[in-house]
C-alpha cells in the first residue's frame, strides 16, 4: 500500500481503463479477504485537497502513501516519484511500431520522462508485442542492459538499477523448452483463446507479422 506505481500505455484512454480495472479489483471481496486494511476513498476526489485522490486515472490508498497513476504514452509524470513503472502496449499496432517517428518519440519519452522519475530501488516492467526490432525493448538491448532468462532462479538474481531481464513467450513454441516455458515444440501459448489452427491460419496470411507474435 505504500508503493507508488505508474502505468502507461499507447494512449490515455487505455491506461485509464487499466487504472479502473485495478480499482475494481481492490474493492472486490476476494482482495478484501487478503488485504482488509487496503482501502480507497469512497468518493471520486479530483484533487488532493481535503481527501485522498481518486478518479479515473489516479488513486491514493487511504492512510498510506502509495497509489497508482496512469498516463498515456508521452504523458507527464512530473512531481511523481515512481517505485514501480509498468508499460503495457506502448505501440498501438504494427503501423505505429514501424513508424520511425513514433519509435523515436517513445524513446525520448522514456529517457526524459520515465527515467527521470525512477530511483535506485525502482522496478520496471515492459510488456508488448515485438512489432519492430528497434522498439523500446530493442533499444535497451542495444545498450547491453538486457539479458534473457529461462529459469525461475534467474528471476531473483540481483540486478543493477539499469539492468533488465527478458522473458519471451512465443505464440507457437519453436525454441527449446525451459523451466519458465516448458511447452513442447509446436504448442500454442494460450490454446483456449488462440488455438494452434487459428495461429497457423494467421501465419499463412503474413509470416513476417506472425513472427512478431
Predicted regions and their residues:
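Short, well-ordered alpha-helical packing segments
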Residues: 6-9, 16-23, 111, 115, ...
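An acidic- and aromatic-residue-enriched active-site/binding cleft used to recognize and process polar
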Residues: 10-13, 73, 90, 129-132, ...
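Conserved nucleotide-state-sensing and coupling region of NTP-binding domains
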Residues: 8-77
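Short, well-ordered alpha-helical segments in soluble proteins
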Residues: 26-30, 94, 118
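Walker A/P-loop NTP-binding motif
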Residues: 1
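A structural signal for short, well-ordered beta-strand segments and their strand-loop junctions
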Residues: 6-9, 69-70, 86, 125-128, ...
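Non-catalytic, compositionally simple segments
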Residues: 95-213
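Conserved RecA-like ASCE ATPase "motif II neighborhood" in helicase/translocase motors
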Residues: 50-113
Amino acid at each position: 500500500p505504500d508503493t507508488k506505481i505508474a502505468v502507461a500505455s499507447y494512449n490515455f484512454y487505455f491506461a485509464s481503463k487499466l487504472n479502473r480495472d485495478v480499482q475494481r479489483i481492490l474493492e472486490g471481496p476476494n482482495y478484501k479477504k487478503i488485504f482488509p486494511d487496503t482501502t480507497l476513498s469512497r468518493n471520486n476526489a479530483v484533487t488532493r485537497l481535503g481527501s485522498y485522490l481518486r478518479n479515473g486515472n489516479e488513486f491514493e490508498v487511504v492512510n498510506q502513501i502509495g497509489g497508482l497513476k496512469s498516463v498515456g504514452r508521452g504523458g507527464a509524470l512530473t512531481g511523481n516519484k515512481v517505485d514501480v513503472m509498468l508499460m503495457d502496449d506502448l505501440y498501438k499496432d504494427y503501423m505505429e511500431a514501424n513508424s520511425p517517428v513514433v519509435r523515436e518519440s517513445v524513446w525520448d519519452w522514456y529517457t526524459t520522462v520515465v527515467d527521470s522519475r525512477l530511483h535506485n530501488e525502482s522496478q520496471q516492467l515492459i510488456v508488448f508485442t515485438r512489432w519492430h526490432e528497434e522498439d523500446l525493448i530493442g533499444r535497451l538491448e542495444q545498450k547491453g542492459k538486457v539479458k534473457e532468462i529461462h529459469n525461475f532462479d534467474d528471476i531473483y538474481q540481483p540486478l543493477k538499477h539499469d539492468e533488465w531481464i527478458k522473458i519471451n513467450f512465443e505464440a507457437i513454441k519453436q525454441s527449446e523448452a525451459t523451466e519458465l516455458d516448458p511447452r513442447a515444440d509446436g504448442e500454442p501459448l494460450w490454446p483456449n483463446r488462440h488455438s494452434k489452427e487459428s495461429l497457423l491460419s494467421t501465419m499463412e496470411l503474413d509470416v513476417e507479422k506472425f513472427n512478431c507474435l
